[in-house]
């Protein structure tokens, strides 16, 4: 099954006093992966965000299996787990990339809800067509 890939090199600013990556950065990278997916695969959604579309994160998780440190090269692989009504659930795998190969270091999940600003209110709306179509090729089932 195909995955959207986002590559990242860990910087010192992402590590803690001990020298490993601070856990919250894994969630930031999920968001960055999602943003790059929109840029690369669904640019019309970025335009819709300027006109009231809101993508609200409703759930996020990450399970850690190994530490990352500065200058580790990480490949995030994002797949569509579920798409229904106005909600999208994505699965993420974090792979440390080295000359010797790859090591799975974390897994995550994120759910977003598509909403539309209407004055003071934010109302649920269906997942935009371009996003729905772009995500299909990355579905897990």
Predicted regions and their residues:
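HotDog/MaoC-like acyl-thioester-processing domains
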Residues: 6, 64, 68-70, 81-141
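Hot-dog-fold acyl-thioester-processing enzymes
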Residues: 1-57, 115-141
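Hydrophobic beta-strand-centered segment that forms part of the acyl-chain substrate-binding groove
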Residues: 37-88
């Amino acid at each position: 099954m195909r995955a959207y890939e986002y590559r990242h090199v860990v910087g010192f600013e992402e590590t803690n006093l001990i020298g490993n990556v601070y856990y919250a950065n894994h969630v930031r990278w999920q968001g960055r992966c999602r943003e790059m997916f929109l840029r690369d695969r669904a640019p019309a959604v970025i335009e819709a965000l300027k006109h009231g579309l809101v993508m609200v994160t409703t759930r996020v998780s990450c399970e850690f299996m190994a530490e990352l440190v500065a200058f580790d090269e990480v490949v995030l692989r994002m797949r569509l787990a579920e798409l229904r009504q106005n909600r999208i659930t994505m699965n993420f795998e974090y792979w440390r990339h080295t000359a010797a190969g790859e090591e799975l270091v974390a897994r995550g999940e994120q759910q977003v809800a598509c909403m539309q600003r209407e004055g003071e209110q934010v109302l649920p709306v269906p997942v935009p067509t371009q996003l729905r179509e772009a995500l299909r090729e990355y579905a897990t089932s």
